[in-house]
Amino acid sequence: MGALTIVAKYMIVAQIEVNGGVDKSDIIGALFSQTEGLLGKDMDLRELQMMGRIGRIEVDIQEKDGKTKAKIYIPSNLDRYETALVAALIESIERVGPYPATVKVLEIRDLREEKRKKIVERAKELIKMIEEEILPDTKEIIEKLKEDVAKAEVVEYGPEKLPAGPDVDKSDWIIVVEGRADVVNLVKHGYRNVIALEGISRGVPQTIIDLSKRKSITLFIDGDKGGEMVLKELMKVAHIDYVARAPPGKEVEQLTAKEIAKALRNKVTLEEWLAQQKAGAEKTEAAAPPPQQPTAPPAAPSQQPIAEVPQEIVKRLGDMQGTLEAELYDTNWSLIKRIAVRELPDELANSTDSIYAILMDGIVTQRIVDLAAKKGVKIIITARVGPLTKVPEDLKIVTFEQLQKLA
């Protein structure tokens, strides 16, 4: 196929079959002569070619057994409607010289689309070249610039002047981290709804406690024992919705954008976290040799509350398992309300009902214990018990397993 004489938008590709031996000039001549005047002067092939609306017609010919088969290529600078009309026009050819002939259009290529694909592929190559040739010093400058911008965006929040991102008030959920460097790193990577505890040696800041009452909290801890200590202290006084953790041995301030995104994507609810920690502890205890002086077992539930739990409630334990729901009862063991376990802290804090007992498929946390005690709850029947630092004497906590064994 020869070079094009115009900058074409489309390429008409057709196939012609002639019942006899002919050459290229015969086929091209038939195209011009047999289409002349069919669609008027404006669509005459010679006129279109003279005006540069179609390019040079190329023919790729093959002759076999006295018959001729050829591919016809017509570059077009017309719009798609006119190009389609020209394609249909050449299909009207019935003879080449003295021989019968048929023409069929095989395709109309969009040459601009092919150019676009080549441009995109070349752009990919150029981007790769740019990325490979950026000097390490340049990358360091960019990282330093990002960090400086992030530091400038860090604000002081609350009476304690805690380091925070600029969007703590705007966002419905916030990320709580340990220190200022953690805040700077998260802001640098686009997380602006972050605030720091600034250590827990002097207790959890009241600002964090207040925020936990009105916003969803994700605690993002370091991947070491220190992170676990922060979690234990915070869960005593504040409501934590989710826990995210840095990879083992890494601190939040050291994480890359990809590591931060992965850790936050893999966050779990506080209940799931505590269950995982308990399962890990039980596995470790099972693998370890018996201690010389075994620690005291968890206090056995009082027989008095066990005895007063109605059999209908005991029978409900099987139905409750796996629901992640909580049921609230009055002193007559009449059902007051059934809610999701995650809604229990808010219900205990705001409900005006007199609640005597709670049946819940979840983990009892110190926050739930504190709210239940304040509400006057006397019995909590639960699937699991998390780490507790203080339980009032008049509040009895019993697990499903204990109740089923003793009932």
UniProtKB/Swiss-Prot annotation:
Its EC number is 2.7.7.101. Mg(2+) 2 binds at residues 222, 224. Residues 279-304 are annotated as: Disordered. Residues 172-248 form the Toprim domain. SMART domains: TOPRIM. Keywords: DNA replication, DNA-directed RNA polymerase, Exosome, Magnesium, Metal-binding, Nucleotidyltransferase, Primosome, Transcription, Transferase. This is DNA primase DnaG. It comes from Pyrobaculum calidifontis (strain DSM 21063 / JCM 11548 / VA1). The lineage of its organism: Archaea, Thermoproteota, Thermoprotei, Thermoproteales, Thermoproteaceae.
